[in-house]
Design a protein with these regions (language model features):
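Conserved active-site and cofactor/substrate-binding residues in soluble primary-metabolism enzymes
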Residues: 8, 22, 26, 101, ...
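Short glycine-biased active-site loop of nucleotidyltransferases that positions the nucleotide triphosphate
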Residues: 69, 179-182, 250-255
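A structural signal for the main folded, soluble domain(s) of proteins
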Residues: 131-134, 149, 171-174, 184-185, ...
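Gly/Ser-rich catalytic/binding loops embedded in alpha/beta enzyme cores
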Residues: 2-174
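Short beta-strand-to-turn element immediately C-terminal to the catalytic PLP-Schiff-base lysine
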Residues: 48, 161-162, 189-191, 215-217
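Glycine/threonine-rich beta-strand-loop-alpha-helix active-site module
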Residues: 132, 174-200
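A short helix-breaking turn/cap at a secondary-structure junction
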Residues: 191-276
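Flexible loop/turn segments at secondary-structure boundaries
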Residues: 125, 176-179, 211, 268-270
């Protein structure tokens, strides 16, 4: 299982591209090979893009660099309830599958910024579930303890980042789907305010609550990604302009003291096994 691993942090990738240590084409080919080796055990991808399917995205990078495209050559994964043009969307239900003619707004934004899709990731069917086990495409396994669940519903997206085949991944969150698998796989799961990231082109679970989320290795990278894509979108009736307080420029230590609470006891509803795992 231990294939070649890569440092896919945004700053490191940009430096490696500038220094000529690798190219987007070479990196994506190596990542595809690693993903193919991992998928039989972890079931993280429903569809891995082939070399031919990735070719247009790589061709669009010609003449560019990290200086002209902030996500130049950055590999990312897409939960398979979010549209990528001409690649089948299943929402983990083969009978529902369709081939979209255009990408979801968020996917189109990221591609325009230079990011390259790796594949469509596995999920609890129709994004309904928090385990990562309710999919006809196989049960997703935890990146650190394969006998444990990955969490869901954005299971494959979390695994793509945790297993080193994507710098970041897109998920969705209606009731925890973008945060639970992040927590179970040692990642940051960013669910922004409803409407800050467009959900146009997303198969709905609950339209009034659905949010597109980011999985990333660090909070700083999640913040960078949010700052790049937070835009209002006329195709999304729930879209809103990004307020200044949601910008990474507004982050920092509070001038006054900050108080937070930690419960003295945790209630696991009588489940001793869960208490022991915690």
């Amino acid at each position: 299982m231990m294939q070649q691993t890569f440092d896919l942090r945004l700053a490191t990738l940009a430096a490696n591209y500038r220094n000529g240590n690798t190219t987007p084409r070479a990196l994506l080919a190596a990542i595809r090979q690693r993903a193919e080796a991992l998928n039989p055990e972890f079931n993280l991808f429903i569809h891995l893009l082939s070399e031919a399917e990735q070719a247009p995205f790589l061709a669009a990078l010609e003449g560019h660099s990290p200086e002209t495209l902030p996500l130049y050559g950055v590999p990312f994964a897409i939960k398979d309830n979010i549209d990528l043009a001409e690649i089948v969307t299943t929402a983990a239900c083969p009978a529902f599958a369709y081939r979209p003619t255009q990408s979801a707004t968020i996917v189109a934004q990221l591609i325009a910024l230079g990011a390259v899709p790796v594949g469509k990731t596995n999920l609890d069917q129709f994004a309904t579930g928090l385990n990562g086990t309710r999919s006809p495409y196989g049960r997703c396994r935890n990146a650190y303890h394969p006998a444990y669940p990955s969490g869901g519903s954005s299971a494959g997206s979390a695994l793509a980042v945790a297993l080193g085949v994507a710098s970041f991944a897109l998920g969705t969150d209606t009731a925890g789907s973008g945060r639970v698998p992040a927590g179970l796989n040692n990642l940051v799961g960013l669910k922004a305010t409803k409407g800050v990231i467009s959900t146009a082109g997303v198969v709905p679970a609950c339209r009034t609550l659905d949010c597109v989320t980011f999985f990333s290795a660090t909070a700083d990278e999640a913040s960078q990604l949010l700052a790049l894509v937070a835009r209002s979108d006329q195709q999304d009736s729930y879209s809103r302009r990004n307020p200044q307080w949601n910008s990474r420029q507004a982050f920092g230590r509070p001038s006054a003291g900050f108080r937070f609470g930690v419960p003295q006891t945790l209630n696991f509803l009588g489940c001793r096994a869960s208490e022991a795992l915690f």
